[in-house]
Amino acid sequence: MKFLHLGDLHLGKTLGDFDLIEDQKYILDQILHITEEESIDGVLIAGDVYDKSVPSEAATKLLDYFLIALAAKRIKVFMVSGNHDSDERLNFGSTLFASNQIFISAVFDGTLHRQSFVDGDTEVAVYMLPFVKASQVRHYFPDEDINSYDDAVRAIIRNTLIDKRNKNILVVHQFVAGKGEDPALAGSESVGTQSVGMVEKIGYDCFDDFDYVALGHIHSPQKVGREEIMYAGSPLKYSRSEANNEKSVCLITISAEEGVKIESVPLKPMRDLRHIKGKLKELLDKKNVKAPDDFIYATLTDEEIINDAMGVFQQTYPNTVRIDYD
């Protein structure tokens, strides 16, 4: 079976005053094209589907468009909530969606829900864990000592029967770290050593029973601890710190013979996000200007503050998001 792993869509997000809905539709259409090219069986969406707990109408319509397109292609969808999402809003209509093989787990109810499928000699079980806090999980396991995010996730997995004869996938939205090292945090909210976006660190070893772990929460694509525990990263650049990142989705092929094979499929945005630095006159010189429709963060090295620098800059780069000085 072939799966496409993505996460951190942040539908409805803005860059400064700029609406990204058109850019997000463009990248989702690109992902739909990849599902056709690669004959994808299922799409794993690892949380932060929306950018805000109360998403805009445009954001909800865009998600509907994406899910309906996947359903029309008979592609299964496995989607969990992230810390940016409203559990109840994302869960709305989940029972109806399930009839079209769109499986949504947005509210933790004490059970790590699973969907199982057989493909030839391979049985694949996809487990879905929405974003959870210790206080939510403690209620369901009163005999467990749960005081942290790590405790909470370990308790859930410990109380779940996992058949190791299957190929087991987990879709989860949390801050997961390796032994002695943290993930690269470009664009991923705050960057504390023990938490990201107020989400505490979880040890990757709690996922030992899973053949592949589809992570969401960190915007930079990367493995954590072992090859089969992956952050897909966000499909678009959402902050200046992501300017040098290359965006992609993870293509996962699972078979009884070869186990789990992981490939990266690059994504190309409609408009890139770039950080440029130099004197204003040099940056706006025609010979130095390229892709003027890109989203631009500019750092000026002029010795004096330039009057209405933003207005001047936007005459050449209309989608300039921010200007600062060095």
Please give the residue ranges for each predicted region.
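Conserved beta-sheet core of the metallophosphoesterase superfamily
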Residues: D182-V260
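Binuclear metal-dependent phosphoesterase catalytic core
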Residues: L112-V124, L129, I229-P292
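Conserved catalytic scaffold of divalent metal-dependent phosphoesterases
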Residues: F92-S195, P235
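Active-site neighborhood of phospho(di)ester-bond hydrolases with catalytic His/Asp-centered motifs
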Residues: L6-G7, V43-D48, K76-N83, F103-F108, ...
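Accessory, non-catalytic peripheral segments of nucleic-acid enzymes
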Residues: E37, G42, I254-D326
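N-terminal active-site segment of His-dependent metallophosphoesterases
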Residues: M1-I68, A72
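Active-site neighborhood of divalent metal-dependent phosphoester/pyrophosphate hydrolases
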Residues: I40-A58, K76-E88, F175-M198
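Metal-dependent catalytic neighborhoods of phosphoester/phosphodiester hydrolases
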Residues: T14-G16, G47-L67, S81-Q101, A106, ...
